[in-house]
């Protein structure tokens, strides 16, 4: 039985046994959707990855990693997870499978690492065992560590060549460092699976620049996905009061924060020099007021009619999923907001073609499943 068939079978069993009894129909322009509960009892889940055997791996920000079955059963926490700085917005963040996972059982975790009273975004890789992580190795550490509790990022995405992108925030109090190539603050990094630097990274030969940097001038990227046709890295980042953005993170480009932004300070004043400046990229799309974006996926399946090719973005502040129709010029042609009524932390397309959501509601957080109600 292939992975898709296994997931479909498990979903049917879950419905039959009442595991998905908590469900409702939500409206969408392309047809009604069924929103059902896959699992509950999670605390601040942050990242999700689907395993070949039909289970999920889910991170919880306090520092736990669990297996979750398609029927919603939570495992005990997997041991061996690196120590995390679970304060403010810090903790255990994203999880990604190595492209060769079926052969090497290797996973990658992003997390906030405590360092002598400070903290930084870090990435570890490990071999996934039955109930523990083995051969854990930290392969990337954001420099410098900062005495701040906010804006760690962080999403992990592998490209088609097997390079790993790591998104990082400006740490809140260090916004000007997003323009400084001598730090990893407010950057997207691109590394090899062992943490070494690809020879074709854009700043490898620039004196004083961190060689891992791929793009810069970012505020706090909490959503990233590869475009299914082009293979380019699409990201979104939180603005301050307004100014959430979607960008294509391209090699060596400057995305402007905090020099340009469509947002304002939380207490009202303007930020930086305006909304545009030569040498700085404009977003493909932005939100004013903020939706609080987190998690992002391109929908490539046929299970939900009319959604194929759309970009899906979770929203913490507005408690929605934004469905964006993208034109051939990468412009957003249309946006629909689908009400979830819970803070959406992550968005993933499942092997069964349904859309899986992590909600971030503290100890009452859940995994939800969006599917066609037809």
Predicted regions and their residues:
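Acidic, Gly/Ser/Thr-rich repeat motifs that build Ca2+-stabilized beta-propeller blades
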Residues: 21-174, 223-226, 231-239, 289-327, ...
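Conserved blade-ending motifs and adjacent loop-strand segments that build the rim/top face
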Residues: 218, 330-351
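N-terminal signal peptide c-region/cleavage motif recognized by signal peptidases
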Residues: 16-18
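Blade/loop signatures of beta-propeller domains
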Residues: 21-34, 73, 131-133, 194-206, ...
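Bacterial N-terminal signal peptides that target proteins for export
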Residues: 1-8
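Short, conserved, GDST-rich strand-edge loop motifs in beta-rich repeat architectures
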Residues: 166-184, 243-245, 249
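Beta-propeller blade signature
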Residues: 121-131, 180-194, 248-250
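Loop-centered beta-sheet repeat module
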Residues: 182-191, 200-229
